[in-house]
């Protein structure tokens, strides 16, 4: 018998920005499908109407498009098993919930908010988790019909057993058994007629033919209840792939509620989309080699969901920044320059050779948003301490710096504008270094410091002189001499 075509889904709630954890779920679902030439479906889960955020659906579309995680079916591209927006499927869920009621697998609950609040307070007083007491399970058919006729608000709850156990399999975590006494009678249909997330995703996953479900391990505890729904309907249970949490550090989960970076934030900080996607792929998955740089096509070929780890993944900003630098260096100079110019223009108003700046920074840049800070001294010399002139490796001191700047200044002043180029300046300065019988760094470090007022610069002394021009270079050398006196 031929195996079923792999079908995965990304089913986000449009409640704001695309969080890193959500993007990883989308990526893993995409890779599982595409590794086996399957289908990747986008479904919008908007049943929690109070949490919806205007524009959030567009963020989902834009992020998937930008990262290349193109879906085969979805609200914007259509498909054979739509609608792909849960709020447009309201009648479907109610029909299936009523079917469960008829089977005795679910029941109407008319309990008031006051009664439910009382149950919660009692549970808190006893320091036990809240669990509905099945009060409405025992209503007769006549009582239920009378309540419905009166128009009393109701929810439909799952009827879970209180004895025995339920076992389910997860690709990552293995076989898990839960005592049925721990299962709550979760709400399937809310009082507004919309399904809960828990119910809608089971119905939709079945009707849309989803074979593999990728989600965070926080849903492990709900999986026995999902399984009981599948079994109650007589449906095949899909393959579960529960992913480990992404941690900010060893104690705290990465969370959009705590203001941790969303995909949009990372883009604004100057990260490249391909670097972010590559890094996120490695948050919980290991290719089994030391190789770490993969484009989306390479990830699709190599990804095996069975290699996803149980262990929490730490979101390491330094590692992401390193990886981003690797991707920046893979860009052509023209590609890098195009991305860098908007950053330069944030701080540079005067006329500079921007392409030359890009040539200097291309191999040194790790983050586009760092560029402005690395070149702002070109526009205006910052105030700086004479401590910058002290450099042990360069054998440079405050005293030697003053002496060497005073000796190089007339050499610089004598260079004609026509000869103001790197090779000629280099030749003249090195003639002086040779005649003084000093180390190169003893001359070059103070020149660089005087021209920039910074410990890090995009180029050395000669590159800075070319960028600044003769007049500005001489002015800054004189300021350095005055500061050192």
From Swiss-Prot:
The keyword Transferase does not apply. Its main location: cytoplasm. A motif ('KMSKS' region) lies at residues 253-257. Its EC number is 6.1.1.17. It catalyses: tRNA(Glu) + L-glutamate + ATP = L-glutamyl-tRNA(Glu) + AMP + diphosphate. GO terms for molecular function: ATP binding; glutamate-tRNA ligase activity; tRNA binding; zinc ion binding. Catalyzes the attachment of glutamate to tRNA(Glu) in a two-step reaction: glutamate is first activated by ATP to form Glu-AMP and then transferred to the acceptor end of tRNA(Glu). This is Glutamate--tRNA ligase. It comes from Clostridium botulinum (strain Alaska E43 / Type E3).
């Amino acid at each position: 018998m031929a195996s079923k075509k792999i079908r995965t889904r990304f089913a986000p709630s449009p409640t704001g920005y695309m969080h890193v954890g959500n993007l990883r779920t989308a990526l893993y679902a995409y890779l599982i499908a595409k590794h086996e030439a399957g289908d990747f479906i986008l479904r919008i889960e908007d049943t929690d109407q109070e949490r919806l955020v205007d524009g959030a659906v567009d963020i989902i579309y834009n992020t998937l498009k930008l990262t290349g995680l193109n879906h085969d079916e979805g609200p914007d591209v259509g498909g054979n098993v739509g609608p792909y927006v849960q709020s447009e499927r309201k009648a479907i869920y109610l029909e299936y919930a009523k079917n469960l009621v008829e089977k005795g697998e679910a029941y109407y609950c008319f309990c008031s908010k006051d009664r439910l609040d009382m149950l919660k307070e009692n549970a808190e007083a006893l320091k036990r988790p809240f669990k509905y007491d099945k009060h409405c399970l025992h209503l007769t058919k006549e009582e239920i019909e009378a309540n419905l006729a009166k128009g009393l608000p109701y929810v439909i709850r799952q009827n879970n057993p209180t004895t025995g156990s339920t076992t389910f399999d997860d690709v990552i975590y293995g076989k898990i058994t839960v005592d049925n006494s721990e299962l709550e009678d979760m709400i399937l249909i809310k009082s507004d007629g919309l399904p809960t997330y828990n119910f809608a995703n089971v119905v939709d996953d079945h009707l849309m033919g989803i074979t593999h479900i990728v989600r965070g391990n926080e849903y492990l505890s709900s999986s026995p209840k999902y399984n009981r729904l599948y079994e109650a309907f007589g449906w095949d249970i899909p393959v579960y792939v529960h992913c480990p949490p992404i941690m900010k550090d060893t104690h705290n989960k990465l969370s959009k509620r705590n203001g941790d970076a969303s995909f949009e934030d990372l883009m604004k900080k100057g990260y490249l989309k391909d670097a972010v996607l590559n890094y996120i792929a490695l948050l919980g998955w290991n290719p089994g080699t030391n190789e770490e740089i993969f484009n989306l096509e390479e990830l699709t070929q190599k990804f095996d969901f069975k290699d996803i780890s149980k262990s929490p993944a730490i979101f390491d900003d330094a590692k992401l920044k390193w990886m981003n630098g690797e991707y920046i260096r893979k860009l052509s100079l023209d590609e890098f320059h195009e991305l860098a110019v908007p950053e330069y223009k944030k701080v540079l108003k005067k006329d500079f050779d921007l392409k030359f700046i890009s040539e200097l920074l291309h191999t040194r840049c790790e983050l586009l948003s760092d560029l402005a800070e690395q070149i702002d001294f070109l526009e205006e010399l910052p105030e700086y301490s004479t401590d910058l002139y002290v450099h042990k490796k360069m054998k440079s001191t405050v005293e030697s710096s003053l002496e060497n700047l005073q000796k190089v200044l007339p050499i610089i002043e004598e260079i004609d504008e026509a000869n103001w180029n790197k090779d000629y300046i280099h030749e003249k300065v090195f003639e002086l270094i040779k005649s003084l019988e000093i180390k190169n760094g003893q001359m070059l470090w103070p020149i660089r410091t005087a021209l920039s007022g910074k410990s890090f610069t995009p180029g050395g002394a000669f590159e800075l002189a070319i960028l600044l021009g003769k007049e500005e270079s001489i002015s800054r050398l004189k300021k350095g001499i005055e500061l050192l006196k």
